[in-house]
Structure formats: structure tokens, C-alpha cells
């Protein structure tokens, strides 16, 4: 792990624009000259003191609260100064420029959190949870991010790593005593522990999957032929008029994106142009974009007109078969048929009316079910795709280890356990390369 920079960094920690309060944050190993020049004298550590923030001539740029946190008991583990002044962009810019005059460097996005990680104040999963908490779009996603920030996810990972260390110690002993008349791999306890570890990995995978859904949401693409009610369905799911609805085929020519909640699950809906052959170059471009959106969907809603049951597949033939598809027969208000949900050849079929709303709740429930989301699941923490990948690689390695235990191949068993431990270490940052760190922290906002 690289040592943190020793220079002093500064940034505005509040969002751009006007507000009642604006904050400038400073962190570094030597803040003495900055404290003297900006405040006249250092404030008492961990006390909120009203101060004037001074320019180079000793005149007040602004007045407000100064908070000083000496190292190591601070967010970054370094000396930290926060200046809470008025939230106008001009006064904040003047204050920021003053800190730069005093030798501070403008912080990179996420650099305060990066220093906290590098100084051991939090691990990588907790650092990522800060960004997830800021970006959360639902109450459930905010609560799951807070659990990760408090260390619940990391505690699960550390427990699994401790189990792996114990197993590795036992297996290494079996290798060391391989020339003796002792077969430690015959101990049934070892097999029980590996099986128990697999069960725990399955449990944490389930929770991490829920957390990833809350963080990232589900990209759901509405597709179908022109004039089957795709835009009406978007409006019905959103509960308000978002898309223009007319009887003229081809009204939607570009992608229309909307984010909303369905039972606490963030849903990113994409309404697309009707899929058909067209001579109109603008409509053709919209259809091309629709096909691109379909290829990247987490779930597809294929809308058909309930009056024309033969109006079947309008989907590109080259779509991945792994993308879940829900077939929707819309406009049952024109046929007199009731709303219903059935499963035909492993495909969910829903009859509904986007205009009246009849059957739309069936669709909402099916989207949640197909996503594998369980509202109100206790102990769910924020997770990312890289976390899921690491957990699943660890599980695969432990499953291989169980096979090698049965064949009593101790060296390969030990190697698989080591690989599992390394995969889990990537989550908390114990085994992480510099490129990954740069990608993670560069996605943070300035001042965090």
C-alpha cells in the first residue's frame, strides 16, 4: 500500500451553489502556519469556535465556525481544519484561494477519504460506502450504505478471513507432517468447517446481491412494436405523465430514461422507439439506440397489443438469453379480459392496461421478484459488483478446496484456501492494486 502524500490538501466540501452554510476542509501533517495565518491563533481542538477567516492583509474574508481535529483523532488521520462559513460561491472561492496561497494543494476527488483509508482510519469497503451513502436514491439504499460505513460488511469479511486462516493453518500442518504417520486431513472437523464456510459465503453473497441492487438499481428496458402502449406503460409505472402518448405510431424516437422506486428498489426505466423497419433516418437512429439499450438491460419488458395476440417477438434475435424477459399484453381495457399473470414456457406473461392501471401492480411485483430483491431484508449492506465478484471467486476456491480435501491433495487444498483469502482481502483493501484505488476514489466528489 502506498504511503499517503505529506502535503496539505484543501477543497470546498459542500455542493456548488448558494446555501446557508459552506465548508472548506483542509488536511495535512503540518497545519500550524495555516492556522496562524487564517485564524490568528489555533482554535481549541474539537471545540466549535466562532472566528474570522483572514486574508493576507488581516481583513476578514468571512466569519463562522472553525473546527480543528489534531492527528490522529480525525477523519483522515492527519490534522484537519474545517471552516464553516456562509454558503455563497464567491466567498467560498475567496476562502479556498486563501488556503492555496498558504501552500495548500487542491484535493483530488475522494482524496480525503483516500487518506483516511491509507492511514488506517477505515477500510476500502467503508470508504466506498461513503460515496454510496452520498449517492443513495432510496431510504433502503441509504440505510444499507450506513451499515457498510459502520463496518458491518467488513466485519463479515474479517470473520470469513479468520476462518480461512484457521483452516490454512491446519492444512499447512498436514503438509508439514506428511512424512509422519499422521493424516490430519482425515479429521472430519476439517470437512465440516469447509462446508460451514461455504454456507456462510452463500449467505453473505445473498446479502451483497441485495446491497448491490439497492446501490445500482435495475435497468429495465421497455420494448415492442410501435403504438402498443410502451410510453403509456412508462407513465403508469412512474405514476405521472413523463412520455408523450399519441395514437400516431413512431412518436417516441429517442430513448427516454426515468429513475423511480418500485417497492424500495431503484428502477432505471428506458422507454424506446418502436421496433420496426423504417425509412425515416431519425426513427432508424432511435431504433438503433433501442437495440443498444436492450443489449445492456437487466430486464426487458416486451409490450404487445392484447387485441393482436400474434403480435409477438419484435426483439433482436441476437439478444443474450440470460436477460430476464417479461411479456406484457397491454390494452386489456379494449378487450374486456381481466388482469392476469401466468408463466408460459418459463416466460412470465402479464395482461394489463397501462391506461387504467389494472394489472400494473402485478408487473411491479414481478419486476421485484425477477430481480431477486427482498424488501426489508435485515442486515443488508451496500455492495458493489466488484464485491460480488470477489465473494463468488472466494466461494469457488473454497468449493475446489473441498474437492481436494476428498482427494487428500493437501498442497492444492492449501492453495485454494489462500486464493479465497486473497479474494476476500480485495474487498477490504488488504490485497488491492493502485489502479483499482485510483478508480474507486476518483469517482468521489470533491471535499470527500
Curated annotation (Swiss-Prot):
Entry binding sites for (6S)-5-formyl-5,6,7,8-tetrahydrofolate: 25, 82, 121, 448
Binding-site residues for Mg(2+), renumbered to this chain: 231, 252
Domain of life the protein comes from: Bacteria
Entry function: Exhibits a very high intrinsic GTPase hydrolysis rate. Involved in the addition of a carboxymethylaminomethyl (cmnm) group at the wobble position (U34) of certain tRNAs, forming tRNA-cmnm(5)s(2)U34.
Quaternary structure, from the entry: Homodimer. Heterotetramer of two MnmE and two MnmG subunits.
Entry cofactors: K(+)
Residues in the signal sequence: none
UniProt-annotated binding residues for K(+): 227, 246, 248, 251
Record GO biological process: tRNA methylation; tRNA wobble uridine modification
Primary site of residence: cytoplasm
Gene Ontology cellular component list: cytosol
Keyword annotations: Cytoplasm, GTP-binding, Hydrolase, Magnesium, Metal-binding, Nucleotide-binding, Potassium, tRNA processing
Cofactor note: Binds 1 potassium ion per subunit.
Compartment annotation: Cytoplasm
EC number: 3.6.-.-
InterPro entries: G_TrmE, GTP-bd, GTP-bd_TrmE_N, GTPase_MnmE, MnmE_dom2, MnmE_helical, P-loop_NTPase, Small_GTP-bd
Record-given protein name: tRNA modification GTPase MnmE
